[in-house]
Amino acid sequence: MVSLTFKNFKKEKVPLDLEPSNTILETKTKLAQSISCEESQIKLIYSGKVLQDSKTVSECGLKDGDQVVFMVSQKKSTKTKVTEPPIAPESATTPGRENSTEASPSTDASAAPAATAPEGSQPQEEQTATTERTESASTPGFVVGTERNETIERIMEMGYQREEVERALRAAFNNPDRAVEYLLMGIPENLRQPEPQQQTAAAAEQPSTAATTAEQPAEDDLFAQAAQGGNASSGALGTTGGATDAAQGGPPGSIGLTVEDLLSLRQVVSGNPEALAPLLENISARYPQLREHIMANPEVFVSMLLEAVGDNMQDVMEGADDMVEGEDIEVTGEAAAAGLGQGEGEGSFQVDYTPEDDQAISRLCELGFERDLVIQVYFACDKNEEAAANILFSDHAD
């Protein structure tokens, strides 16, 4: 018999006694009975990994006295499809069917209320759809800016110091649920990160130098921001970038990233432009100030990309356009084994695809995600399985 304690985001504890041979699915069933929900809504996390239903308690390494974090997702609302009854055909006027003609008024009268029922159900269906959109919008994911500060304050109310909370959020890529899990269970060694570089007050107060005559791009469109900044500073990128870096006191072409981040960004831009947007999203989640920094200094960002791809910005923008149009990244073990990473298609690219990568991708697919999506996120996260799982659950879970 193994005694385990299950905790959630609110630090509610649910003790359960299990057999080592019990599967995770059986464990979820017992836990669901204790907290009054369905086992399909429960996710169990231990040591930074989502436990699979098919494995047993002993196979997951759970021992007597261990603590497991559980998260309960919102129950999907099911819409009942209302089918409109067929309209009664007009009665014939032939002499042989006079009886049916005489009976038609009563039939039409009884069919009228039934025909109006679907019309009355339309607002209810619209209300259900609105409720689903609201629930989807409120699903917790990455938090940045003011929302991140509010999250820190809420977690501090649980008894943690601000430094501990910020460290956990950085390790969890700004995912509140995962950060609380790390505070309860400890941050894995491979996710411990050094303190981020503090941005100077001059950089925060520096006004944007983008041209005011051109139409401003959407706030969330980093590519349009960067492209507009590149056009505005065409022919003078070196001068503008040098002035910006001099004001910030940093090296040329620096926008506050670590060396590892720059290497990953340049590698993705050079060999796989389609994965640039997921990588930027991942980096922005770890460095909340990066997004504002790029929008305030688009010319520095463009200069860095140009340096990475040899002044061929068109390839980067075409890769981003292809990604938006829905092209998928296709990587197969056979192609990698035969050294065929570079195909004939325009969207092909070469990657190191090992059997370990195939196993990791298969495990992520077992969580219920499409293989094409898993491959994109997995390689965008530099083959970090835990980071890929975090992004999949945060941004792509239904």
Swiss-Prot record:
Annotated localization: Nucleus; Cytoplasm
Domain Ubiquitin-like residues, every copy: 1-77
GO MF term set: damaged DNA binding; K48-linked polyubiquitin modification-dependent protein binding; polyubiquitin modification-dependent protein binding; proteasome binding; protein-macromolecule adaptor activity; ubiquitin binding
Protein's UniProt name: UV excision repair protein RAD23
Span of domain UBA: 146-186, 355-395
Record's subunit section: Interacts directly with PNG1.
Record cross-link Glycyl lysine isopeptide (Lys-Gly) (interchain with G-Cter in ubiquitin), residues: K49
PANTHER family assigned: UV EXCISION REPAIR PROTEIN RAD23
Modified residues (Phosphothreonine): T94, T139
Role of this protein: Plays a central role both in proteasomal degradation of misfolded proteins and DNA repair. Central component of a complex required to couple deglycosylation and proteasome-mediated degradation of misfolded proteins in the endoplasmic reticulum that are retrotranslocated in the cytosol. Involved in DNA excision repair. May play a part in DNA damage recognition and/or in altering chromatin structure to allow access by damage-processing enzymes.
Misc remark: Present with 10900 molecules/cell in log phase SD medium.
Organism, scientific name: Saccharomyces cerevisiae (strain ATCC 204508 / S288c) (Baker's yeast)
UniProt cross-references to InterPro entries, sorted A to Z: Rad23, STI1_HS-bd, UBA, UBA-like_sf, Ubiquitin-like_dom, Ubiquitin-like_domsf, XPC-bd, XPC-bd_sf
Record-listed Phosphoserine modification sites: S121
